[in-house]
Swiss-Prot record:
Homodimer. It holds the Pfam family PGI. InterPro entries: G6P_Isomerase (IPR001672), G6P_Isomerase_C (IPR023096), Phosphoglucose_isomerase_CS (IPR018189), SIS_dom_sf (IPR046348), SIS_PGI_1 (IPR035476), SIS_PGI_2 (IPR035482). NCBIfam families: PRK00179.1. PANTHER family: GLUCOSE-6-PHOSPHATE ISOMERASE. D-glucose 6-phosphate binds at G156, S157, S212, K213, T214, F215, T216, T217, Q356, E360, H391, K516. The keyword Protease does not apply. This is Glucose-6-phosphate isomerase, cytosolic B. Belongs to the GPI family. It catalyses: alpha-D-glucose 6-phosphate = beta-D-fructose 6-phosphate. It comes from the Eukaryota. It comes from Oryza sativa subsp. japonica. It is found in: Cytoplasm.
């Protein structure tokens, strides 16, 4: 039977609710005048520096949040995750993405069995295969070495690996290792995405990685069949075994598809899709592109934060602090969104990955016991690298809705540039904005300041910035594979902390099921109409009208022959 105990019923939660009034009367201009407060609101680990002094919080706020963490049994929940307890209760599964990057000699159990040796078994297999592939020993159907990889997956099988790939592309060591190679991703079932993923590629030199745990994911398998047709039409049916491999646990369907089961790489049901980038889902395609040693550095970076998260006191624990502040902003100050603003173009795919990781994890309306929540959980996550975002949506952030911001900066650029005679280097120009924007949000600009600057009266209200808009700054020493892994792990654990405090299950995603079920009905109707001329039926009047309009136009792909992208 579901328990009615919710975190919002605790004295600690109610104490924070009462505390909101005091914070509402305080402006960040005044809070930032307290140098001791600013110094206290920092944390550092392995050169990663967090400054959260521009949050609408005081020392008292933080103490109350730490007490809320105690009431939520946060430490106990973290230990349960690392110990392999089945904290994903709706699916009766452990949550062990931390095992994917654990050292070889570590013991992490699920159902009483240490999973680390099995994880390393898959990693060793990936290492061996990637070395064979990259050396040119693995050749395609025509005897040519393969230099192009297309990874076919969707959701977590796509967004996480894409983020890491984009971040590594301009790292000097990774770029050198990837010379002469291409890694692309195919996710959307839209045929345009198929066309883009294979544009200018030669099937003779291309390897396709099909990522689907069950080998039944509708979009992924349709895309896989499409790329199979692309290969077979050019090289013949026997080429599939040399040009397609899989990340899956369903070896029967892998073999039926035409892929040699020896070339299938496993992952486990205790790895959620959005947490799977450190499994074969990400490690395999990334190792094919960059080499396993570089990917291992990425995994080691993630593992370093796992250790920090598990062992550091909450007061200096970066993921815990971030999670607590997010709960404060969402559930007490009422801010529904979060902007993720990396001042590094290499992190251009970070916000989309965190968008899925956060919103799929914490977009829940009931407690882990199935009790309807009386408070909001989760945020609307979005973002864009600086300074591009400044010329896009910062207007709203400065003078519209209040949206807490995560500013992520890097001390040492992957690609330093300086033009003789310029005032600053290109990276210093970028970082000038990184350091300025949080203060602009916090302090704002008053009518009095504008009057002193002789701004015309009719423009005073337009040029006034209220300020008092919260942000935090996360400064990384550099952006090598190691730091990329650290950044990923920080956000993974931050999001888990939020879920642990709210008392929800951050590791299931039942919300994606209904739409898929309804799409199945539409798919059957489209088939019946296209192939048998049957009228649209079984839908509400609006959907029926839309479907009828769609079907009234002659399809661009006749159903009596195979049609492939024209690229």
């Amino acid at each position: 039977m579901a328990s009615s105990a919710l975190i919002c019923d605790t004295e600690q939660w109610k104490g924070l609710q009462a505390h909101v009034g005091a914070i509402q009367k305080t402006h960040l201009r005044d809070l930032m005048d307290d140098a001791e407060r600013c110094k206290a609101m920092t944390a550092e680990y392995e050169g990663i520096f967090l400054d959260y002094s521009r949050q609408r919080a005081t020392g008292e706020t933080m103490e109350k949040l730490f007490k809320l963490a105690e009431a939520a049994k946060l430490k106990e929940k973290i230990e349960k995750m690392f110990s392999g307890d089945k904290i994903n209760s709706t699916e009766n599964r452990s949550v062990l993405h931390v095992a994917l990057r654990a050292p070889r000699d570590e013991v992490i159990k699920s159902d009483g069995v240490n999973v680390v040796p099995e994880v390393w078994g898959v990693k060793d297999k990936i290492k061996q295969f990637s070395e064979t592939f990259r050396s040119g020993s693995w050749v395609g159907a025509t005897g040519k070495a393969l230099t192009n990889v297309v990874s076919v997956g969707i959701g977590g099988s796509f967004l996480g690996p894409l983020f890491v790939h984009a971040a590594l592309q301009t790292d000097p060591e990774a770029a050198e290792s990837a010379k002469g190679r291409q890694l692309r991703f195919l996710a959307n079932v839209d045929p345009v995405d198929v066309a883009r993923s294979i544009k200018d590629l030669d099937p003779e030199t291309t390897l396709v990685v099909v990522v689907s745990k069950t080998f039944t994911t509708a979009e992924t398998m349709l895309n896989a069949r499409t790329l199979k047709e692309w290969i077979v039409s050019s090289l013949g049916p026997d080429a599939v075994a040399k040009h397609m491999i899989a990340v899956s646990t369903n070896l029967e369907l892998v073999e039926k598809f035409g892929i040699d089961p020896k070339n299938a790489f496993a992952f486990w049901d205790w790895v959620g899709g959005r947490y799977s980038v450190c499994s074969a889902v990400g490690v395999l395609p990334l190792s094919l592109q960059y080499g396993f040693p570089i990917v291992q550095k990425f995994l080691e970076g993630a593992a370093s934060i796992d250790k920090h998260f598990r062992s550091s006191s909450f007061e200096k624990n970066i993921p815990v602090l971030l999670g607590l502040l997010s709960v404060w902003n969402v559930s007490f100050l009422g801010y529904p969104a979060r902007a993720i603003l990396p001042y590094s173009q290499a992190l251009e795919k970070f916000a989309p990955h965190i968008q899925q990781l956060s919103m799929e994890s914490n977009g829940k309306g009931v407690s882990i016991d199935g009790v309807q929540l009386s408070f909001e959980t989760g945020e609307i996550d979005f973002g864009e690298p600086g300074t591009n975002g400044q010329h896009s949506f910062y207007q709203l952030i400065h003078q519209g809705r209040v949206i807490p911001c995560d500013f992520i900066g890097v001390v040492k650029s992957q690609q330093p540039v300086y033009l003789k005679g310029e005032i600053v280097s290109n990276h210093d120009e970028l970082m000038s904005n990184f350091f300025a924007q949080p203060d602009a949000l916090a302090y704002g600009k008053t009518p009095e300041q504008l009057h002193s600057e002789k701004v015309p009266e009719h423009l005073i209200s337009h040029k006034t910035f209220q300020g008092n808009r919260p942000s935090l700054s996360l400064l990384l020493p550099s952006l090598s594979a190691y730091e990329i892994g650290q950044l990923l792990s920080i956000y993974e654990h931050r999001i888990a902390v939020q879920g642990f405090l709210w008392g929800i299950n951050s590791f299931d995603q039942w919300g994606v099921e209904l739409g898929k079920s309804l799409a199945s009905q539409v798919r059957k109707s489209l088939h019946a109409s296209r192939m048998e001329g049957k009228p649209v039926q079984g839908f509400n009047s609006s959907t029926a009208s839309l479907l009828t309009r769609y079907l009234a136009v002659e399809p661009s792909t006749p159903y009596n022959t195979t049609t492939m992208p024209k690229v």
